[in-house]
Amino acid sequence: LNQDDMIAARPRTPIRVCLLGATGTIGRATLATLMRRGHDVVCFARSCLGGALAVDGPEIRVVDVRNPVSIARDGFRGERFDAVVSCMASRTGTPRDAWAIDHQAHVNVLAAASRLGVGHFVLLSAICVQKPLLGFQHAKLAFETALVESGLMFSIVRPTAFFKSLSGQVERVKRGKSFLVFGDGALTACKPISDDDLADYLADCLEDDRRWNRVLPIGGPGEAITPRQQGEALFALLGRKPRFRRVPLALLDSVIGTLSAAACLAPPLSEKAELARIGRYYATESMLVLNPETGRYDAAATPSAGTETLFEFYKRLVDGDAAPERGDHAVF
């Protein structure tokens, strides 16, 4: 047995976990994994979303994570917790939302956890923070820094790409339309990871001391894949000849420029401009480990975990065995 197998095989000691972001797709998968492993899980959730949790068993506490008083009074309640696991993230990625949730809400929870002597904080971050050009990336990095400097044991997990973020074109291709790519479809690559595989990785952080006090980039199994390869695989599953439509990056640049200029007169458009900038980032930057010496993305240096591949997920979507759930962060 290798060390991973030995860790998986050894008896687990149940611990008490505060779970943030349990109503998102990754959060729900993480909740199910933690419950399956026998941990005592308490979810901090907004009142309007608490009923979305499909897993029986966890205690759900209605907490406003933007309010330190609510976190202490309604959340932790002065009780003992062994760990905090956060899958919480801003819904849109716009600066105001990101600094409120990705940074300040986490700072609030960290402060309360520190006062109560919580021993471990597992944070779901994102691999894109290694090259921060956007507001939400700076917000995430600011909290990463606060966590590292807090003195709490930490595990900062930076996944590559989620299956849901790469599934936005499945339905359009099933309807007979072409697959959209930026440039030639090979500008970027990623090693996407499934919800369940990432949930296992997050839960393992509680038990595997090799993941303590570390920043952990992680992708899914297999080779890195480009958008064009994603399209080719999808057409193959449908038994059709590949059809691609190229979207010039200049189009995104034009949209960004127009919205940015218009935002001077209509400030609400600034958020739309930021969303366009986010789209351009994902269209031009690979979700892989960035080599600081060469400035290049390195698929070989990007660790892998799990068993499910994106193309297996595509097959489930095509066969109707899974439903796409893209959320707010899908490019298409």
Each predicted region: which residue ranges?
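Glycine-rich Rossmann NAD(P)(H)-binding loop
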Residues: F182-T188, R214-A224, L238-G239, V247-L249, ...
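A hydrophobic C-terminal alpha-helical subdomain
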Residues: A250-F332
